[in-house]
Amino acid sequence: MKSQIFFAVAALFLLTVRTYASKSKEQDLRDALFSAMFSADNQLNPQERECRYWLGTCSKTGDCCSHLSCSPKHGWCVWDWTFRK
C-alpha cells in the first residue's frame, strides 16, 4: 500500500515538472517571437517595392512596370501601346 502511494506521488511530481518545463519553453518561444515582430531593425531598412502589373492599382506611372502606364481615370496600370524586348 505504501509503495502504491509513493509511486502515485512520484508520478504526480514528474508530471508537474514536465508541465512546468514545457510552459517555460513556450514562454521563451513567445518572447522570441514578440521581439522578432517588434524589433526596430525591420523599420529602419525599408524594402524597395516591385512594379505593379497589368490592372494593378497605382497613383502615378512610376508605380507601374515599364510597359504600362497609370490610367488617371481608374487608377489602374494599363498597357501604353509600346512594344519592347
Swiss-Prot record:
InterPro entries: Huwentoxin-1. Its main location: secreted. Residues 1-21 form the signal peptide. Expressed by the venom gland. It is found in: Secreted. Disulfide bonds join 51-65, 58-70, 64-77. SUPFAM superfamilies: omega toxin-like. The keyword RNA-binding does not apply. Residues 22-49 form a propeptide. One of its GO terms (cellular component) is extracellular region. Keywords: Disulfide bond, Ion channel impairing toxin, Knottin, Neurotoxin, Secreted, Signal, Toxin, Voltage-gated sodium channel impairing toxin. One of its GO terms (molecular function) is sodium channel regulator activity. It holds the Pfam family Toxin_12. It comes from the Eukaryota. Ion channel impairing toxin that inhibits voltage-gated sodium channels. The recombinantly expressed toxin shows a weak activity against Nav1.7/SCN9A, and shifts the voltage dependence of channel activation to more depolarized potentials. Belongs to the neurotoxin 10 (Hwtx-1) family. 18 (Hntx-VII) subfamily. The presence of a 'disulfide through disulfide knot' structurally defines this protein as a knottin. This is U5-theraphotoxin-Hhn1a. The lineage of its organism: Eukaryota, Metazoa, Ecdysozoa, Arthropoda, Chelicerata.
